[in-house]
Regions:
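Short hydrophobic beta-strand element within catalytic cores of glycosyltransferases
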Residues: 259-262
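A charged, aromatic-enriched C-terminal amphipathic alpha-helix characteristic of glycosyltransferases
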Residues: 301-358
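Conserved acidic donor-binding segment of nucleotide-sugar-dependent glycosyltransferases
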Residues: 274-275, 279-285, 295-300
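Conserved catalytic-core segment of nucleotide-activated headgroup transferases in glycan assembly
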Residues: 18, 135-136, 149-214
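Aromatic "clamp/platform" in nucleotide-sugar-dependent glycosyltransferases that forms part
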Residues: 242-243
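Donor nucleotide-sugar binding/catalytic pocket of nucleotide-sugar-dependent glycosyltransferases
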Residues: 118-134, 138-156
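Short alpha-helical donor nucleotide-sugar binding micro-motif in glycosyltransferases
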Residues: 229-234
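Membrane-proximal helix-turn-helix segments that form the acceptor-binding/catalytic region
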Residues: 61, 104-122
């Protein structure tokens, strides 16, 4: 069976790692002929990842000279090229609802959301995504194939060692600081608000956007084996993401004997249980998160309880070979099933496009109204009388004269006179 996975690039990331692992299992254990198709020109070298040597990597023009049983988009932008690749069936491997990666007024948000309406079958990695896709596209085939774990790299410790209170709590923060939804700086700030002794390590593949942070160590990018070793040296992984798919890093940490403090982000309920193997904190609660970390620093019995149960949770999680078998079954089912209903997909696409355009028009109207208000205020502030008022406003007699106005409309006065 011939399968093409369309990818934007082969740079180090969790999403690409999942695609590569599935492709590898299909080739090694299920007799598939798999190609990783790069849909755009590459400026940077590929991720130095050994399994890539066993996979066929093609450019889009090269892939268009072939014919596949199933062509699979793996990111919303790869759907732009999906139907250029000759295939009997088309599928979309959805690792998150990717419109959520963008701010509300970003054009990419609408584009990413519309790709869900394409006439494709869906494969996804988390229960919440599968349920959402089935609600949005009841006409489309949708199957769930959870991510596996490389049990050789993220090996489960035979025994979880007790971490004594004499040592500081070892906290690990991981994520791309340029991704607003990862909230890496919020996590660092929460650790900084701790009262108990602690040691903070920050891991990021790209340090652009990180800046100067209060951390004992900043490392990265790390290979999977290096990341596994770091998890093993840590007590707790702190993740304050607001958008996730299957939420893989805490599961990797569980395998290495670390627990997690996290928000109730999508994907957490696949394996996280508050008070059993991790702690779930509130959104945007720096001090509450710091208190949860302080609790683990003080109560080493609770810390050990969570870490031991995290390791037990990890023991029950499947490896990549098991999940590769499910991916093979999903792709065979897509190949054998009837193609999706193009009319139903077109109906959903045009309906969502119409709603998206109305929403975008509303945003633009609000922006134009705010711009007009800002222009009016700017003209008032630059009026010669206002310029003169700013020069004398801090004098005692001026403050006495403007006291009633400052009491009645302090915000208006600040906007007019400026800081």
């Amino acid at each position: 069976m011939k399968v093409a996975f369309l990818v934007n690039d082969l740079q180090l990331s969790g999403g690409i790692g999942v695609v590569v692992q599935h492709a590898l299992q299909l080739v090694r254990h299920h007799g598939f002929e798999v190609a990783l198709v790069l849909v755009r020109e590459q400026d940077d070298p590929h991720w130095a990842y050994d399994p890539l040597e066993d996979l066929r990597i093609l450019s889009l023009p090269q892939a268009c000279e072939q014919r596949y049983d199933v062509a699979v988009a793996t990111w919303w932008e790869t759907t732009f090229s999906l139907f250029d690749v000759p295939a009997e069936r088309y599928a979309y491997f959805v690792q998150s609802l990717e419109d959520r990666f963008y701010e509300p007024d970003a054009a990419e948000r609408l584009g990413a959301g519309l790709t869900i309406d394409l006439p494709v079958a869906f494969i996804t990695e988390a229960s919440w995504i599968a349920q959402t896709l089935r609600d949005l596209r009841p006409d489309a085939l949708c199957m769930i194939v959870r991510n596996g774990i490389d049990k050789d790299v993220f090996a489960i410790a035979e025994r979880v060692e007790v971490r004594l209170q004499s040592a500081p709590l070892r906290v690990l923060v991981e994520g791309n600081p340029r991704s607003w939804f990862k909230h890496v700086h919020d996590a660092i700030d929460a650790v900084g608000a701790m009262r108990e002794p602690h040691h903070l390590t920050v891991v990021c593949g790209d340090r652009v956007g990180l800046g100067d942070v209060r951390a004992d160590a900043v490392v990265g990018p790390l290979a999977p084996a290096e990341m596994a070793a770091l998890y093993g040296d840590s007590d707790v992984l702190l993740k304050l993401s607001s958008v996730e798919g299957m939420f893989g890093p805490p599961l990797e940490a569980f395998h290495r004997g670390a627990t997690c403090v996290t928000t109730a982000v999508t994907g957490n309920d696949e394996y996280i249980e508050h008070g059993w193997n991790a702690l779930i904190c509130d959104w945007d609660d720096r001090h509450g998160t710091a208190r949860a970390l302080d609790l683990l620093a003080r109560d080493r019995a609770l810390l050990h309880f969570l870490r031991a149960n995290a390791a037990d949770t990890a023991r029950g999680w499947p490896d990549w070979r098991q999940q590769g078998g499910l991916m093979a079954l999903a792709l065979r089912r897509i190949r054998d099933a009837a193609p999706p209903d193009g009319v139903a997909a077109a109906r959903a696409l045009t309906s969502d496009l119409s709603a998206g355009m109305r929403l975008y028009a509303s945003h633009m109207q609000q922006r134009n109204e705010f711009a007009h208000q800002a222009h009016v205020v700017s003209r008032l502030r630059n009026h010669p009388l206002m310029v003169r008022a700013r020069r004398v406003r801090d004098r005692r007699w001026a403050r006495a004269l403007t006291w009633p106005l400052r009491r009645l409309a302090p915000g208006m006065l600040r906007r007019l006179l400026g800081p």
